């Protein structure tokens, strides 16, 4: 049977699975997660993951027949291609790999289009995809809601309880709340303890979640197409609170894979071409209603734009204020750049 190495590239690093080309839904023969170092380029963890997996396969006398990598932008694709040199690596647009895996597993509903809600450590990407043509109708990205933002809020919540935690520890506690309802954190220096519950996390993230629901509605209004489902992707989608909250706010059927952060890596296995250095891009459809409002209908307008700016400013100010009110001694000194204000970027349909 043919062994394929599937890799997904993201802001937090790379995830890779080694599996048979016709069995990406089963437990992989091997998997690895390579975090991205502070300041490192996106291609570094990707190549590290590929090297580790290939070396491990050789040690087991296994032959990797192909390698495919997902990317979110053309800039990342070009960087990975340049760093890989002569290596035969297929590069695939991430939404295409996600759709292919969902269709393969039967999770993709029989509908004209779906919303891909991909929430990772650095932000939220919302893509309205046409299921009949595997094309992008519209895509937008927001950094108002992110895994890193969640971690900052958890860290602040622990500091209020007298527990000093670094970013990695805060993330571990936040991720633990996807499985447990209550997490007890301990300060290794003082012995102090603080309890964080799922309800605490839901309260901290409520404003960002409401913003993301508005974000989804804005994307669907631009295309003029009603999606048949909301597909939750990315590691943050493991949170039961997030899934329940979005179901109530958006009112669409929820599609969820038990390992949402590995959907891209598994899906790209199905798209490996076995051709030298293939590049699989997702086409973009020209949707008339996405370029201009329908007759008699106004576009998003100034009110919605102002509302989005207000939410962004409020969330940014809230986090900054919360962190600023803490005694500086409650926070460990760490390297790296200071967090930047929340930004909204748009990937328009041409």
What are these regions (language model features)?
Residues 39-52, 186-226:
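Adenine-nucleotide phosphate-binding core of ATP-dependent small-molecule kinases
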Residues 67-76, 220-247:
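Glycine-rich phosphate-binding loops at beta-strand->alpha-helix junctions
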Residues 78, 83-164, 197, 210, ...:
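Small-residue (GG/TT-enriched) beta-loop-alpha framework at ligand/catalytic clefts
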Residues 1-70, 75-79:
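Conserved phosphate-binding loops in N-terminal lobes of ATP-dependent enzymes
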Residues 56-86, 173-174, 185-189, 194, ...:
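Short beta-strand-loop/turn "lid" adjacent to the catalytic site in phosphate-handling enzymes
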Residues 94-105, 150-151, 255-311:
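Glycine-rich phosphate-binding/hydrolytic loop that grips phosphoryl groups
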Residues 1-24, 106-136, 175-182:
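Gly/Thr-rich phosphate-binding beta-strand-loop-beta motif of the actin/hexokinase/Hsp70
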Residues 130-206, 238, 244, 307-321:
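Phosphate-binding glycine-rich/basic clefts of nucleotide- and phosphate-handling proteins
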